[in-house]
């Protein structure tokens, strides 16, 4: 039995297309109560399917994520680099659909996603990912909740944080690490960013 104190982030990254790693971060905060304590969150980003990642790699990532039985899964943007044919779209959708999370799967869009936005949105929504486009979501766990704020590539912080109660633990996710300068850390406890192709984490 794995007993975790606080929230645990499993950050799935890769050094090169053949070397996937899992980095574990354990978060402690007085905003995490008994109900939200022990949540496991899996974060992955920058798939760039067809450029860096093929079908075999997708299976490896799927196994690494599902191995930890995450409560929440977050995708940090850049799903693929060029329009997918039907066969590749089916393979990518199969991978995303196979990911399992008790309290939901969430995504933000990256710069590459904006080039093929309708296809990306269709794939993500059809595989049960909720896209946070300068929006936030309350994730309820046994009557308590944490905030998840999603910033797109043109971050609109006012809209993204609308209604966020800073008394509750708040995650911000952004594809661009540069959005860090725009975030109000009086309302943010933890931020995750992609785009660097090896993930970035910021704890204020």
Across the structure, where does each feature detected by a protein language model lie?
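Short, surface-exposed loop/helix-turn segments at secondary-structure junctions
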Residues: 203-204
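A secondary-structure boundary/capping signal
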Residues: 23, 28, 43-45, 76, ...
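Acidic, histidine-bearing metal-coordination/catalytic regions of metal-dependent phosphoesterases
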Residues: 1-40
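A broad, low-amplitude sensor of folded, mature protein cores
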Residues: 25, 58-67, 71, 155, ...
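A broadly tuned "polar low-complexity/structure-edge" signature
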Residues: 15-16, 22-24, 55, 60, ...
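Conserved catalytic scaffold of divalent metal-dependent phosphoesterases
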Residues: 31-34, 49, 111-192, 196-200
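Sparse, context-dependent recognition of short Cys/His-centered cofactor- or disulfide-binding micro-motifs
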Residues: 5-12, 84, 133, 157
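Membrane-embedded segments
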Residues: 18, 35-130
């Amino acid at each position: 039995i794995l007993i975790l104190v606080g929230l645990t982030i499993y950050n799935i990254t890769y050094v090169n297309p053949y070397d996937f790693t899992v980095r574990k971060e354990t978060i402690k905060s007085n905003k995490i109560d008994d109900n939200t304590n022990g949540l496991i969150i899996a974060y992955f980003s920058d798939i760039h399917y067809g450029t860096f990642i093929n079908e075999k790699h997708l299976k490896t990532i799927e196994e690494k994520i599902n191995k930890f039985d995450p409560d929440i899964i977050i995708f940090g943007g850049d799903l693929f680099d060029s329009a997918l044919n039907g066969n590749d779209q089916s393979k990518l959708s199969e991978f995303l659909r196979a990911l399992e999370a008790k309290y939901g799967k969430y995504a933000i869009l990256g710069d590459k996603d904006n080039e093929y936005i309708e296809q990306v949105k269709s794939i993500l929504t059809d595989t049960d990912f909720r896209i946070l486009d300068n929006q936030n979501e309350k994730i309820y766990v046994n009557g308590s909740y944490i905030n998840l704020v999603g910033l797109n590539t043109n971050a609109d912080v006012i809209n993204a944080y609308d209604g966020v109660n800073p008394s509750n633990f708040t995650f911000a996710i952004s594809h661009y690490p540069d959005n860090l300068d725009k975030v109000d850390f009086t309302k943010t406890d933890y931020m995750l960013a992609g785009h660097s192709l090896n993930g970035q984490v910021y704890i204020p």
